[in-house]
């Protein structure tokens, strides 16, 4: 599982 979050 890879989670990438850009804010």
Curated annotation (Swiss-Prot):
GO terms for molecular function: pheromone activity. Keywords: Pheromone. cCF10 is involved in the conjugative transfer of the hemolysin plasmid pCF10. This is Sex pheromone cCF10. It comes from Enterococcus faecalis.
